[in-house]
C-alpha cells in the first residue's frame, strides 16, 4: 500500500464521505457486508477528527424506490434493499453522525442504478460550494459504492484518500477488496489509516 510520508492535518476544506452505512448492509439486513459493523468505531473516530477541524462530513445512502432496477425482482443482481423510508435504508444507530451531516441520496430513480455518491446527485456542487479539495472515503462496500465514489472523485479533480481501516468489502471472490483498493491507488488515490492523520 502507498502511504503519505508526512502525517496529514485535516483542514476545513476537507470532506469525510461515509458511504452507505445503512441497516440493510449490516448484519440482519437484506444485503449484509461481512463484518461491516467492525468499522463503525473507526468511522466514528474519523467523524470526531473532522468535526474538530470544522471539516465537511457527508453520508451517502442508497435510496431505492420499491421497484428499483437493481433488484432481483426486476432481473437485477441484488435482493430488494435500502427502500426509501424503511428501516433498511436508515443509517445504523451506532454511527455518530453530526447534526450538520450532509446526506446524499443516490440510486433513487426507478430505472437507473448508481453506485457513486456523485452520480445524479448534488454532491460535487455541494463540495465545490464549500471549497473542498480533498475527500476521505469510508464505508461499504469497498468494491462497489466506495470504489465508484472514489473513482468519480478522482475524475472530478479531487485528491482522494481511502480510509483503509474504515472501509469493508464483500470480498467475493477473495482478494477483490484488496484489488479494488490497489486499483484506486493506481489511479491516484492514497490509502491511509487513522494513525496517518495528525490529531490536534
Briefly describe each language-model feature range.
Residues 69-73:
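Short aromatic-enriched loop/helix-cap "lid" or pocket-rim segments at secondary-structure transitions
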Residues 22-28:
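Short acidic, Gly/Ser-rich segments with clustered Asp/Glu that frequently serve as metal-coordination loops
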Residues 2-17, 29, 35, 41-54, ...:
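Active-site-adjacent betaalpha module
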Residues 25, 66-67:
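Feature marks short, surface-exposed loop/turn motifs that line or immediately flank catalytic pockets
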Residues 61:
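Catalytic-core segment of enzymes that process non-peptidic bonds
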Amino acid at each position: 500500500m502507498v502511504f503519505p510520508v508526512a502525517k496529514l492535518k485535516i483542514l476545513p476544506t476537507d470532506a469525510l464521505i461515509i458511504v452507505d452505512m445503512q441497516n440493510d448492509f449490516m448484519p440482519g439486513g437484506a444485503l449484509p457486508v461481512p463484518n461491516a459493523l467492525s468499522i463503525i468505531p473507526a468511522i466514528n473516530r474519523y467523524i470526531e477528527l473532522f468535526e474538530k477541524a470544522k471539516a465537511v462530513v457527508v453520508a451517502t445512502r442508497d435510496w431505492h424506490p420499491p421497484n428499483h432496477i437493481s433488484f432481483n425482482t426486476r432481473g437485477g443482481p441484488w435482493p430488494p434493499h435500502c427502500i426509501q423510508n424503511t428501516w433498511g435504508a436508515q443509517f445504523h444507530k451506532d454511527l455518530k453522525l453530526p447534526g450538520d451531516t450532509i446526506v446524499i441520496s443516490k440510486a433513487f430513480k426507478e430505472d437507473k442504478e448508481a453506485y457513486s455518491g456523485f452520480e445524479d446527485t448534488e454532491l460535487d456542487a455541494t463540495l465545490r460550494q464549500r471549497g473542498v479539495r480533498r475527500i476521505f472515503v469510508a464505508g461499504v462496500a469497498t468494491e462497489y459504492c466506495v470504489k465508484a465514489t472514489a473513482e468519480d472523485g478522482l475524475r472530478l479533480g479531487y485528491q482522494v484518500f481511502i480510509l483503509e481501516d474504515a472501509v469493508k468489502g464483500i470480498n467475493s471472490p477473495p482478494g477483490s477488496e484488496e484489488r479494488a483498493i490497489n486499483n484506486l491507488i493506481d489511479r491516484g488515490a492514497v490509502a491511509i489509516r487513522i494513525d496517518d492523520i495528525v490529531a490536534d
